[in-house]
A protein has these predicted regions:
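C-terminal charged capping/lid subdomain of soluble metabolic enzymes
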Residues: 312-385
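A glycine/threonine-rich phosphate-anchoring loop and its flanking beta-alpha core
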Residues: 20, 111-210, 306
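Active-site segments that bind and position negatively charged phosphate/pyrophosphate groups
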Residues: 203, 207-327
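Glycine-rich beta-strand-to-loop/alpha-helix junction loops that act as flexible
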Residues: 38-40, 96-98, 248
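ATP/NTP phosphate-donor binding region
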Residues: 1-92, 341
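Short Gly/Thr/Asp-enriched flexible loops that form oxyanion-binding sites at enzyme active sites
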Residues: 51-52, 81-82, 101-114, 147-148
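Glycine/serine-rich anion-binding loops at beta->alpha junctions
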Residues: 90-106, 139-145, 280-281
Length: 385
């Protein structure tokens, strides 16, 4: 087990009916004016937004609204949110939604007081120092952004997608009511399941295997999510399965399953190029295409063999590496996830473009058991075609 630091300050309010406490929670922490941030309108149609405003009103917390945040959020939208929060005198950004809404709020929070462009932070021209607090009302189990230190934005002017990892990104509190996820479309639920799995699967495929405690925590999380995923897709109103997915989403990406490991989220890097190229590609759907190909790439070279064998046996109950990879594909397939780049309309030419973008035309290499440069990334994308 390698040395590590782990700091998870986000307070969770978990369970049925917790969203009704948002006013009490915000007022109890001294907030006086919240900016409610949300996405495409489901929060309005479901009545959730009205319930949140009623709760804030009852506790004397003033509020404004910033809606229309899209999937695969943009730096431009983030800058508009920061400007509006500054204009309205907001002292809390309240993100109502999933990863896209939360990530936009996180990055906007760094810009409200400083007036900086959010891209300054993703490009490390500045470090977050004076950030507005962020609270979350979570509506989908997926990214784990409600407790993570990361946020991802796309610059529409350049088509570049970048992330920022910073302890300043961790929300102050997160309200997590599994019942809010029961009306999600099946495809969106399935994309979330893949995303939850991937945050731990990538960390599990580490280059230092001597970390039995974190291995077993990871295996327990993954097998629990696999089981809960099957249950939820068969019965969307299964509360216990929904609760398992929602909590697992946080645990999978708050740093716990990477503690003491040497690992990188390189399959995520490859997927980011896909959704940067076409923002209609859901992150989880893209990962469902990349991950089996990523594993196959290493298996063909006889690399990560012990890890891949353990992955096959402990996660999928398979005796061979090939069996584990196929079981992964079959699980994703059972939810209707895409299997190939062509399922998104992406071509070999697109794969070449993404390979060059991902590695900055070969100038960038990702550290792994085999360093991943331009040629390696090309091959992984080719296995996705």
């Amino acid at each position: 087990m390698l040395n590590f630091e782990l700091y998870i300050p986000t307070k969770l309010y978990f369970g049925r009916g917790q969203c009704g406490r948002v006013g009490e929670i915000a007022a109890g922490r001294g907030f006086r004016r919240a900016l409610i941030c949300y996405g495409g309108g489901s929060a309005v149609r479901s009545g959730l937004l009205e319930r949140i405003k009623t709760s804030l009103d009852a506790s004397g917390v003033e509020h404004d609204e910033f809606g229309g945040i899209q999937a695969n959020p943009t730096a431009e939208c983030c800058a508009r949110m920061a400007g509006f929060a500054r204009e309205r005198g907001s002292d809390l950004l309240l993100a109502v939604g999933g990863g896209s809404v939360i990530d936009t709020a996180k990055m906007a929070a760094h810009c409200v007081r400083t007036g900086r462009d959010p891209w300054d932070y993703t490009e490390h021209r500045a470090e977050p120092t004076d950030s507005l607090p962020v609270g979350v009302v979570l509506t989908i189990a997926a990214t784990g952004s409600e407790t993570s230190d990361s946020a991802v934005l796309t610059n529409t002017a350049t088509g570049v997608k970048r992330g920022l990892s910073s302890e300043k990104n961790r929300p102050l509190f997160a309200i997590m009511d599994p019942e809010l996820t029961m009306t999600l479309p099946p495809y969106q639920t399935a994309c979330g399941i893949v995303d939850i799995l991937m945050h731990t699967m990538e960390r599990y495929m580490c280059t230092n295997p001597d970390n039995e405690l974190i291995d077993r925590i990871s295996e327990g999380l993954l097998t629990s999510v696999i089981d809960a995923g099957r249950r939820v897709m068969a019965e969307p109103a299964d509360y216990e399965a929904r609760a398992t997915l929602m909590l697992a989403g946080s645990l999978s990406h708050n740093g716990l399953t990477g503690a003491g490991r040497a690992c990188g989220l390189w399959a995520h890097k490859l997927e980011h190029e896909m959704s940067a190229l076409d923002d209609r590609i859901a992150h989880g759907a893209g990962l469902a295409v990349v991950w089996p190909a990523y594993l196959e790439f290493f298996a063909r070279r006889g690399l990560f063999t012990e890890r891949l064998e353990r992955y096959a046996e402990k996660i999928w109950g398979e005796r061979t590496v090939e069996g584990g990879i196929e079981a992964t594909r079959e699980y994703f397939r059972s939810f209707g996830m895409p299997e190939r780049l062509s399922d998104f309309g992406l071509t070999a030419e697109d794969a070449e473009y993404m390979s060059c973008r991902c590695t900055d035309d070969g100038k960038k290499t990702f550290p792994s058991v085999l360093p991943l440069g331009l040629e390696e990334v090309r091959e992984i994308y080719s296995l996705c075609l």
